[in-house]
Each structure stands twice: as C-alpha cells, then as structure tokens.
Amino acid sequence: MIINKPSRVRPDGRGKVTGELKYMTDLSFPGMLYGKVLRSAYPHAEIVSVCTIKAEKMEGVQAVVTHKDVPGLNRFGIVIPDQPVLCEDRVRYVGDAIAAVAAETEEIAEAALELIQVEYKELEVMDSPEKALRPNAQRLHEDGNILHRAFFSNGDVEEGFQASDTVFEETYELPRQMHTYMETEGGVAVPEDDGGFTMYAGTQHGYKDRFQLARIFDIPEEKIRIVSSPMGGSFGGKDELNIQPYAALLALKSGRPVKIHQTRKESVRSGIKRHPMKITIKTGADHSGNLLAHDVKIVADTGAYATLGPAVLDFSVEHAAGPYRIPNIRTEGISVFTNNGVAGEFRGFGGNQITFALETHLDRLSGMLGIDPLELRRKNIRKPHDLGPLEHRIAPTDGAAQVLNAISKSPILKKTSRNCGYLQRGTGAAITMHGGGLGFGRMDAAGGRLSLSSEGKITASFGFEECGQGILAAIEQIVMEELGCAAEDISIVIGDTAKVPKSGSSTASRGTSMVWHAIQRLKKPFLAQLKKRAAEWSGCSAENLIPGAAGLRDKNTKALVVTYKELAEKGPLAEETAFDFPTTPDPVVGGHFLYSFGAAAVEVEVDLLTGDVKLIDCEHAIAAGPVVSPQGYRGQIEGGAAMALGYTLMEEAKMTDGRYAAENLDHYLIPGIKDVPDMKLIAIEDLMKGDVYGPRGVGEIGTIAITPAIVKAVHDAVGCWINKLPISREELLEAIDRKGLKQWT
C-alpha cells in the first residue's frame, strides 16, 4: 500500500528551518577556550620525541596535553579499546592524535600546534590489505594485522557446484566513503566542581561515551554528564568517540570550558569511513535457475584501529546470500588492519557492499542462464517460515516476496531501453534484506520512561539521540497514538545522561522500534496510575475514564473530567521499563531476529560522449511493518537513496600511501538536489499473523538496493557490467568503446 497516514510537522521542525535550534557546536559558555588537536604528520611512524615547551609559553595558550596527561586508560574503542587517545610511541594513520592545545582563540590554538615539535622515524606504510597480509609485513598491532575473521558454512559447496549446469565467478570492489554530515565533529567540555565534567557533543550513544570517558579519566561514570542532542547528522560516524577526550582533558587541565569543532579537513583525516571491500563470489545454478551453491570471500580494509570493524564484517557475512535460500553456502570474511583511515560504522553497516556484489552477480548469472533477473530471484526467494541466513531462528516474515512482487509491477520496469543518439536509457531492479538491532547475541538493552511533569506534561524520556533521523517525531507520534493524548500534552526528553534512562544506541535501525516496544510496556501501568489519581480527584470510576487531549475524559460523553495539569498538582507520577531488543533464540549461531526488506527499480541515462550516468526515475518498495511517522519514513528512504547514489556514481575517499587524496568537499563530490529525481515509495505495512514486534527500522534499508539496481540499468542501457564502484566515467567509456558504441573520434 501507499502511505496514506497524515504527516505532522516534526517537533524540532520549526527550530531547524528558522535557525533557532542550537546544535552542540553552537553552544558557548563564559570563559570558554578553543581547542585544537595535533594529528600525525605520517601514516605510519615511531614517535621519537614530543616537545610542547614553545606551545605552552605562547601568549593566549592555557593548556597543552599529551599522553602523559591521560589519568586513566589511554585508549578508546566501542568494543576493543585499541586506539590511543594521545599516541605515546607510534602513529598508525594520519588521524592519530599526539597533542592538544586550548587557547583564548581558535587562531592562537592553531598557531600553537605549529610550535609543537615532534620527531618521527618513518615506517613502511601498509596501505592495502594485500600488503598488510604479506608473510613478512610489519605488525601494526601486537596480535598481527588481522582484526577479525568470520565464517559460515551450510551444506556442501563443492557438491553443489558439481551439480550445477552453470557456475559463475567474479570479484567486486567497493570504495571507502565519507559520511559528509553537515555538522562536523565538535562540542564543548565544561569542568564541574566535583572533578568531573559535562560533555556537550554529538554522539549516537551517550551512555557508551560516558563509559569510555570514565575509563579514560579514571573517575566514576556518575561524575560525567553527556548531552548529545541535537546534532547535524551522523550516519554512524559519531558513534565512536571523536573530540570528546581532548576537549575534556583540556577543560580539566585549564579549569575552563573548552570547545573543539573540527574543520572539514580535520574531520576527513580523523573520522571514520565506510569499509572498502573486495568481494569474490562464485555461484552455481541448474538450467532452471535454482541456485545450488554459493561461495563468498570478503576482504575488508578496516584501517588502523578496530572500532566496530568486527561487527561490520559479521553483518556482511550474515547477508552474503541475501533474501535467498541456497542449500550449499560457504562465506569467509577477513578484516585487515592497514595504515589507512579507520573504517567502521556507516549507514548500511556492511550490507551495502555485500548486496551490491550479490545482486549484480545474480543479474549476470541470470543472463548466462537466459532467465529474467526477477524470475531468478522469485525462484529462490525465502519463504515465510524459513530459517534466517545463518540457519538461525527469526521472526517469520514474507517481506522478501512482498517487496519482490511489488517492485516487479513498477512502471519503470515496463520501459524499454531507449537509444536517443548519444544518450541511452536502461532500467534495473534489485532487492535486499537488513537485520535490525545489534544481532549476534550481543547485549542490546533498551528502555524508556513515562512521567507526568509538574507542568502537567506527559514526559517521554529515552536515552536516544536526535541525529536528524526524526526520533523526536517518532516518539511524539507513538505516544499520541498509544496514550490518546495530543501533541501539546507531550514533552520529550532525550540525549542527556543526567535526565534519561538507558535505551541503548541510536544505531542499527533500532530507535523507532525500541520506542514502540517501550510504550507498549509502559502504557498500561502509566494509564492505570493516571486513572486512579483522576478517579480519586473527580469521584468518577476509573473504568469510565480514558486519556484524551488535555486530560482524562468521560468514556461515554468524551467530556473533559480532569486536566493533566490538575493531576500533576498531586505530585510526581512515573513508570519506567527496561528490556532487550528482540534477539534470535540461537545466539551461538548469531545473526539477527528482525529484518526489514527493500527493493528498488530505477531508470538511468548514460551519456556515450562523457560516460556520465544520471538517475532519471526511482521507485522503492519497503516492507518494515507499520509506518509510524510518514514524513520520517519517506525521508529516510529518499535520503538513503541519495546517499547510495553518491556511493554508486561519484564518492570515493581515495588514499595513496596512507594519505587522503581529497581532504575537503571541493574535491570529494556528493549528490546535489539536481542529481536526485522525484521518488515513488510503496510502504508495505502488513506483518504476518501473530507478529507482535511492531514497526521495524528503515534508517538503513533505503541505502542498499539502489546501487545494484543502477548498475543493472547501466548494463541495460549500454551492455557493460560494472564490478567496481563508484562507476568510473573513464572505465565506462572504455567499456562502451569495446562494445562498439563509441560516439566520438
């Protein structure tokens, strides 16, 4: 069905469009200093010495810190704390921090960095997984250059290939991508009288930041307050610590608030990126199109440090067969340390890379078999009660068939290839599935609180962050629908560890789903408290009262009996819940329990003179349960598609010898409004009978299927297959030339 639920203005909408909303990097405090971080001059080197005397003596400089100033663990990392806060004896990439300065102005702090003398001894740069995996390669970490291995096997792959009539093998290469959020990493650390501090900085998990910072500063977590919302975009890039340790070190040393706001160049050098991957797939099928064997090898460049590299690889391995049943499968993944930029959490979380390779591979295999690409998928699509992709138990779902059937009817796919001289058009489609939550048996706690404030507002408190994804709108909509109150009756508190319960991370397409689950648990006891108090106040029977706009109303007449403000005068009232994200009963096997499904159909235009590829038309079909916030749902899918468009056609954070080729957006192009056409969206809200898990997340699913769909459409237009992203104009022109379609001399 098409979304027909009315849209609402987001709670933060007015503040954003008027510019009145204050982001963390907009904040200032009395006596505030400005901080800068000295990053490594080399991608790989020993640190012989560091001298900060000249910087310390510079007028206007109030604090300089090195690793000697870190009171606790001089390491950070969400899962594996392997990245130095401030390097002691070695740097492993150009984003490594060596020292930090706080001064009266940003210009003075910048100048002071130039006065810090660092003597290096350069080391060989491991700038590719191939180089880092050589037998004699220098070890980047004590345990070697392999961060993580992941493996899954089912059936007998070799027997499957022997039984196949057609076997096809190909290698696909995926690029490093920048998050390019509008607000680069930044914030303010404010020292407190008890020896702790308040950190105002964008993050996707305030409580996790608090845990890491407490470990670094060797102080109780309760002495650290994290205020993390709102922020101007994240997409996974602010899930890990960035400027927080440096601002806090400088604030505690100087005794004054310290603000650090990275320039785009600083963000590029130090920030997390999407994992580059090289994926080799070998697939066998019989003459009817039944997939019999599937062998996948994944090599991921995780850069200098771990962050969430292991989880990204696990996710790719889990989704290596996508929404298809293949009896014989073997998937091997390896994540390799290099001296390149750190790769980690990024919208799609490894699903983008493996889905491009898989879906493109199936399109090519269908051509060899002489079978329609969508028919090949239909023959092998997962059934509602099949086990999950790792042969684990999951919530029964027919989402894969739903999106396949919906996108098969797209008017886009009814168009035929068109030759308009030097402009040729083609169409393509692809489907995908995406696990929600952390998965793999990992701790995935959630929670929330409903309370009645002294002002008479129903206050919904969650430990989530507003990254621009619309969690505020989702909370408001769910509370309105489940409690029957009006938007004016609601107050929302998020992004402040001093005020909210633990809800887990604002990642993994889990936020909206967890809010829905929390309110399901909270509404009955919370309403019971409201009704009991209202009955005592009014003399009415609690059974005859229902919540509504402004207060409790008579169930029959709908007349207002008592306002929320009047109920609040009797004292505080609250209910809190804590629970876990739904997980598979097979945590040893791993994988996710809830999945969203998506499909995309596209039309592209290829310029035979320039090699340009333009997206002309696009339609999405998404199966992710009930729609909570229509404009938020659509925004996630369309915004995700725009991000995927950049990944497919233009974005690559190239590195040579461990250095970025582009350190600003004047040389790293992302899609503009003219690159993105109007998009159609089919939201499939139906869940299987007995499904009690409500809405699934859609924050990532829109970024995935569009890439292989575009690649298929390019082939439909000019007959050339693309194995490497982003699509290179030069390589496409060479392929066009080989096809005899050359339009120039």
Swiss-Prot record:
Give residues annotated as binding Mo-molybdopterin.
Answer: 204, 235, 508
Q: How is the cofactor bound?
A: Binds 1 Mo-molybdopterin (Mo-MPT) cofactor per subunit.
Q: What induces it?
A: Expression is very low in excess nitrogen (glutamate plus ammonia) and is induced during limiting-nitrogen conditions (glutamate). Expression decreases when allantoin is added during limiting-nitrogen conditions.
Protein family: Belongs to the xanthine dehydrogenase family.
Q: What is its EC number?
A: 1.17.1.4
Its lineage reads: Bacteria, Bacillati, Bacillota, Bacilli, Bacillales
Q: Which reaction does it catalyse?
A: xanthine + NAD(+) + H2O = urate + NADH + H(+); hypoxanthine + NAD(+) + H2O = xanthine + NADH + H(+)
Q: Which gene encodes it?
A: pucD
UniProt entry keywords in alphabetical sequence = Metal-binding, Molybdenum, NAD, Oxidoreductase, Purine metabolism
Q: What organism is the protein native to?
A: Bacillus subtilis (strain 168)
What is its biological role?
Oxidizes hypoxanthine and xanthine to uric acid.
- The protein's name: Probable xanthine dehydrogenase subunit D
Keyword check for Metal-binding? yes
